[in-house]
Curated annotation (Swiss-Prot):
Pathways involved: One-carbon metabolism; tetrahydrofolate interconversion
Coiled-coil region list: none
Gene: folD
Name of the protein: Bifunctional protein FolD
Keywords linked to the UniProt accession: Amino-acid biosynthesis, Histidine biosynthesis, Hydrolase, Methionine biosynthesis, Multifunctional enzyme, NADP, One-carbon metabolism, Oxidoreductase, Purine biosynthesis
């Protein structure tokens, strides 16, 4: 059998459409325009492209977009002072500091400085703790997108066996918490787990977020399982041309076994910005004491 392709382009477009409707309603009914501030330190080309995409999609959703660009050699104190200003700015409901930061800056201190109520990346330790405690929290965007995509295939994840390969603070750990909140049975694994293929073969849901190109092979997949590939890896093209993007899953092999699978590119990556905007709207509503939006 050939797996159903879970199309990130279509799903993210639908989500952004619903989001724009909710933003328009909040603006109309409550006079609140959600605002997202993005802080870019240095001039990393990939980060600049990502920030431009965020700005464009933020405006298209009807939100206010604020960009702050700082040189790579900015002192830590100056960066923290900017975050303090954004924390106090009533027009800003979401703050995202583009990672990774240049050498010499303490990422943990910067993340901790963002007001948890405006931490739309969901990385502040307060939000991580709230999520682990089953309380309302702004959640990292990529895990949020993974859940949305899994629910395109399964109306409920309750009782399903899920494996998360990868234990990062950005994806693996929060994804485990979200799956537990959905009443899935979760195994968390990583590159040093023993007999990882056997663990994968038991899973109805496979989430690969380990950062190793095509590590998860087709014969690791349980027939009919749903595979969500978070990896984005550049590998040399066999013909010497441009590098190609591949995931953490060997797509050509896995799609012959899985029931549904996300492609790379065109999968989870497209959901990340859409979920960032969802978090910004949720933050704006929470800050103003409004009901949780319907997205």
């Amino acid at each position: 059998m050939t797996a159903r392709i879970i199309d990130g382009k279509t799903i993210s477009a639908e989500l952004r459409g619903k989001l724009a409707d909710e933003v328009a309603r909040v603006v109309r009914d409550h006079g609140v325009t959600p605002g997202l501030a993005v802080v870019l330190v240095g001039s990393d080309p990939a980060s600049e492209v990502y920030v431009r995409s965020k700005h464009k999609q933020t405006k298209e959703a009807g939100m206010a977009s604020f960009e702050h660009k700082l040189p790579a050699d900015v002192p830590q104190a100056e960066l923290l002072a900017l975050i303090g200003q954004l924390n106090a700015d009533p027009a800003v409901h979401g703050i995202l500091v583009q990672l990774p930061l240049p050498k010499g800056l303490d990422s943990n201190a910067v993340i901790a400085a963002v007001d948890p109520a405006k931490d739309v990346d969901g990385l502040n330790p307060v939000n991580a703790g709230r999520l682990a405690s089953g309380l309302f929290a702004l959640t990292p965007c990529t895990p949020l997108g993974c859940i949305v995509m899994a629910k395109q295939v399964h109306a409920s994840l309750e009782g399903m066996n899920a494996i998360v390969i990868g234990r990062s603070n950005l994806v693996g750990k929060p994804l485990v918490q979200l799956l537990l909140n959905e009443n899935a049975t979760v195994t968390i694994a990583h590159s040093r787990s023993r007999d990882l293929p056997a663990l994968c073969r038991q899973a109805d849901l496979v989430f690969a977020a380990v950062g190793k190109p095509e590590m998860v092979r087709g014969n690791w997949i349980k027939p009919g399982a749903t595979v969500i590939d978070v990896g984005i890896n550049r590998t040399p093209s066999p013909d010497g041309g441009k590098d190609k993007l591949v995931g953490d899953v060997a797509f050509a092999e896995a799609k012959e076994v899985a029931g549904a699978i996300t492609p790379v590119p065109g999968g989870v990556g497209l959901m990340t910005v859409a979920c960032l905007l969802v978090n910004t709207l949720r933050a704006a509503c929470a800050i103003h004491g409004l009901p949780k939006p319907a997205v």
